[in-house]
């Protein structure tokens, strides 16, 4: 079958032919319809330090997808041929304390689709049936293909009560923009997103944020004053991994504020911890999606009117995958969809 693989320990992704995966007793075989390119895939494409330490070569990559069930393991129940599915990209062990306690998103033995095992940038994918999620009929293939990153946004945004709160989102990448849209949709008062990329700030404006602030040109304190905010932000969603953005967030949080961190900062990032202590801030790390509460919330948010369509900016045939990666690497894109039909 046709697949996009990391064939060499150098920059690039290559189209190749690999054997169709075999279906185990507890697995589903999924015929891929559409995939989306993730920032992780760009890291793998660029063969950065993290990729060199993490990715086995050769490896079929990719973990954002929608497809159709075409094969079912003999022990699987609850699925039928033709079901339209996406799937949780974190494969968990099922045996550790967190898995057995229902906190599977915190499994210490997690492996990643398209990172530690073959991914979805292929005509067919095999995953455990436990990881598959049926897509409601009124959700399009395009939206279903970005459920994985949308789930990161939903998990982060819904970590805390947002109704009537003032929310700061640092980082206007696709996940940050989706998190801001979720916050506004569920009843936050002011949702302010910051970045230095004007293209992506404009995407955030299309998604309905209160203010999209280019911090290279505008002071966040001035924006807060303009909005009548006198006590700081109640909730912070840190999506950038940029130390200056996190420090600004700490400066502008209200006392007792709550911060959810999805962005990955440098390991040696320094902050003024007295601000965390004396403001009584609560900081929560976010990894992946809650299984499967986040997935149900994703579907419900879209069904209740949340419009994510502006975040999908580029669509290509998989044969034009290089154009898709070029768009992602340019910084002038939202989500990029590859069609396998």
Swiss-Prot record:
Task: Enumerate the residues marked as the site Important for catalytic activity for the proton relay mechanism but does not participate directly in the coordination of zinc atom.
Answer: 148
List the catalytic residues.
40, 43
Q: Where in the cell is it found?
A: Cytoplasm
Q: In which pathway does it act?
A: Amino-acid degradation; L-threonine degradation via oxydo-reductase pathway; glycine from L-threonine: step 1/2
Answer yes or no on keyword Ion transport. no
Q: Which domain of life is it from?
A: Bacteria
> What Gene Ontology terms for biological process does this UniProt record contain?
L-threonine catabolic process to glycine
What is the enzyme's class at the highest EC level? Answer: oxidoreductase
Binding residues for Zn(2+) 1, per the UniProt record?
38, 63-64
Please classify the protein's predominant subcellular localization into one broad category: cytoplasm
Q: Give the protein's cofactors.
A: Zn(2+)
Q: What is its EC number?
A: 1.1.1.103
Keywords attached to this entry: Cytoplasm, Metal-binding, NAD, Oxidoreductase, Zinc
Question: What InterPro entries does the annotation carry?
Answer: ADH-like_C (IPR013149), ADH-like_N (IPR013154), ADH_Zn_CS (IPR002328), GroES-like_sf (IPR011032), L-Threonine_3-DHase (IPR004627), NAD(P)-bd_dom_sf (IPR036291), PKS_ER (IPR020843), Zn_alcohol_dh (IPR050129)
Q: Name one Pfam family in it.
A: ADH_zinc_N
Q: Where does NAD(+) bind?
A: 175, 195, 200, 262-264, 286-287
Family classification: Belongs to the zinc-containing alcohol dehydrogenase family.
Listed HAMAP family:
Thr_dehydrog
Could you describe the subunit structure of this protein? Homotetramer.
* Record's protein name: L-threonine 3-dehydrogenase
- Please give the organism: Salmonella typhi
**Gene responsible for this protein:** tdh
